[in-house]
């Protein structure tokens, strides 16, 4: 059953092109680093810029592998060796030099270009292990990761590099991080949009979430008088929900009175099926 309040999914070819543009931007930013900057702190606590680059390469290779094996009707783990393999790969990759990182990113771009199906191909619907989804889900995950971590690199790529389509996708994907008594109202958008645990939806009326329109009939909807409403611009709210520092912190209100921003839940698991 299609939810009439859910905005359209991002266009696959648009996502593929923008993910490639983001990877190229990361590679260009990496070329400008010296050894000290590479070893310096990123925007992610405990990770150097080299760790971020290692992760970008690792997640890109993981999603390329999902697509490559799906083309042969095979399902494989997201990371070879699971979570332990992921961590070991990041730590090993963090020892690369600037030139080695650039080479790895360039090779990754070529691999991804070859791995993704052609425009309109039915291969986009092939199943993958990632979130029990399809090759489209693997592509969107890569797009999400490379755009977010491009900013985490803290090397000149800011939130202004996030296209509007990414911001909308992040709100839909990360809405599950919100508690049931929290909803988000976006300001400055041509269409009234709201975000709640059910994801991104077209707003029904001020103060009421349209989650009653979702297929889950037990969802009672959200009344702003009973919970917290977070208001902010698209990119700022998306950054906050992604656990990143927004350019302008969103505002939170309970019963019309300003209140601290609510806590958010964990990042959706790569093993959780898509909604």
Outline where the language-model segments fall.
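Generic structural signal for individual residues within well-ordered alpha-helical segments
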Residues: 50-53, 102, 238
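Hydrophobic, proline/glycine-rich low-complexity stretches
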Residues: 2-18, 22-36
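Active-site-proximal cofactor/substrate-binding loop regions of enzyme domains
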Residues: 14-18, 28, 36-65
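Helix-loop segments that flank and shape redox-cofactor active sites
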Residues: 27-48, 115-131
């Amino acid at each position: 059953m299609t939810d009439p309040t859910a905005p359209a999914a991002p266009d696959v070819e648009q996502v593929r092109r923008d993910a490639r543009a983001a990877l190229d931007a990361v590679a260009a930013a990496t070329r400008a680093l010296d050894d000290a900057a590479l070893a310096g702190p990123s925007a992610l606590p405990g990770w150097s810029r080299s760790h971020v680059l290692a992760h970008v390469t690792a997640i890109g290779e993981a999603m390329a592998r999902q697509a490559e094996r799906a083309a042969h009707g095979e399902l494989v783990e997201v990371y070879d060796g699971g979570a332990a393999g992921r961590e070991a790969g990041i730590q090993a990759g963090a020892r690369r030099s600037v030139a080695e990182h650039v080479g790895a990113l360039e090779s990754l771009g070529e691999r991804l270009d070859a791995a993704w199906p052609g425009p309109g191909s039915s291969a986009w619907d092939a199943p993958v292990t990632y979130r029990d989804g399809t090759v489209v889900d693997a592509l969107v995950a890569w797009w999400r990761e490379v755009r977010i971590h491009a900013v985490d690199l803290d090397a000149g790529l800011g939130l202004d590099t996030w296209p509007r389509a990414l911001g909308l996708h992040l709100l839909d994907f990360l809405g599950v991080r919100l508690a049931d008594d929290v909803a988000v109202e976006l300001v400055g958008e041509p269409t009234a949009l709201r975000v709640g645990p059910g994801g991104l939806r077209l707003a029904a009326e001020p103060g009421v979430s349209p989650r009653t329109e979702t297929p889950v009939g037990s969802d009672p909807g959200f009344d702003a008088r009973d919970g917290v409403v977070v208001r902010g611009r698209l990119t700022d709210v998306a950054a906050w929900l992604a656990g990143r520092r927004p350019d302008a912190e969103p505002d939170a209100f309970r019963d019309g009175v300003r209140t601290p921003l609510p806590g958010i839940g964990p990042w959706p698991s790569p093993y959780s099926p898509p909604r």
